[in-house]
Amino acid sequence: LIFRTQNEKDLAVTKRIEEVHKTGQPILVFTSSINKSEHYSDLLNKKGVKHLVLNAKNHEREAEIIANAGKKNSVIITTSISGRGVDIKLGGKNEINDDKTVIKKLGGLCVVGTERLESRRVDNQARGRSGRQGDIGESIFFLSLEDDLMRIFGSKTLESVLGKLGLKEGEAITHSLITRSLERAQQKVESHNYDLRKQILRFDDILNDQRKIIYQNR
């Protein structure tokens, strides 16, 4: 779902989390940074939604927190890099069958993405947190034209598209053109990052050659 402004998106994110949380369905909220995770934590605190924040500031319990993300009433806000390699069990890490059955009836784990990230691979990893190994689950991404990725690439074009489609304030839209534009933006970032890594490796090779010459002359 894409909105015009960050504020409109934030209202939609918190509303969705509130609605899902009332049912008891577990929720895992993905953000792009520590600042963003704390931003959404503040919004949920104002709504009285109990939750945990998992980021680099409290990573000691990372594996335990992520492993229990599938428990009833669980709401966890995390950054995109947290909990890699940790399986999320519906009903919690103890895998009690009755608890798992309850969570399945509620719809499994609900993954909420608060923006599209710079890498399609990371986006897919976030989506893949729900519906693992045949379990039921759902994922939804909330975007705005003021997101970092959108501001850097393609927001003017998308703004024009949204205007032509008659999008009103507070309304959201999904459209194949928007999806393609986002994927192109991510490809540009991935290509840029790849070029940077190649340059760094090239400089490393030069430095290593210089070190060898210095050692040989000693």
Feature locations, PLM:
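Conserved nucleotide-binding/hydrolysis micro-motifs of P-loop NTPases
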Residues: 1, 34-37, 58-60, 81-85, ...
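Structured core elements
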Residues: 2-3, 28-31, 36-39, 52-55, ...
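Conserved interdomain hinge at the start of the Helicase C-terminal
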Residues: 2-28
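Short, well-ordered alpha-helical packing segments
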Residues: 14-21, 38-45, 51, 63-70, ...
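Conserved motor-coupling elements within RecA-like helicase/translocase cores
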Residues: 17-24, 34-108
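C-terminal helicase module of SF1/SF2 nucleic-acid helicases/translocases
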Residues: 101-218
